[in-house]
Structure formats: C-alpha cells, structure tokens
Amino acid sequence: MPKLKTKSGVKKRFKFTANGKVKHGVAGKRHRLISHNAKYIRQHRRTDVVSSTENRTIKAWAPYGLN
C-alpha cells in the first residue's frame, strides 16, 4: 500500500502538542487592527486549540504527524 500524503495546508497551519491536541493561529490579525478594540487584539494574540471534532479531521489529514 502506498504512503499517505499529508495535506500541504495542514503543514502550514497547524502544530501538534505533546498530548496530541492541535494548535492553530487565530484569524483576524493581519491588517485593519485599528478597527478592533484592545480586548480583541489581546485575546487573539496567542495560538488556540482546535475543538475535538475538528481534531480528528486534522489528524486524518496528517497521518504521520507534523515534524
């Protein structure tokens, strides 16, 4: 059986934690930040963890993990 390929979009956008959760960057931080308040900018500063339902899908798209 041939090797499975990892989706290239997953390689660029996600990282796996040590416990197997999936991290992603938060959207809405590229431009036009002057129109958002300080709370929005502060809360979107860090990465976020993907929900458990999407977690299964992303792991299927990266069958051998992300190194």
Swiss-Prot record:
This is Large ribosomal subunit protein bL35. InterPro entries: Ribosomal_bL35 (IPR001706), Ribosomal_bL35-like (IPR021137), Ribosomal_bL35_CS (IPR018265), Ribosomal_bL35_sf (IPR037229). Gene3D superfamilies: 4.10.410.60. SUPFAM superfamilies: L35p-like. GO terms for biological process: translation. It holds the Pfam family Ribosomal_L35p. It comes from the Bacteria. The keyword Ribosomal protein applies. GO terms for molecular function: structural constituent of ribosome. Keywords: Ribonucleoprotein, Ribosomal protein. One of its GO terms (cellular component) is ribosome. Belongs to the bacterial ribosomal protein bL35 family.
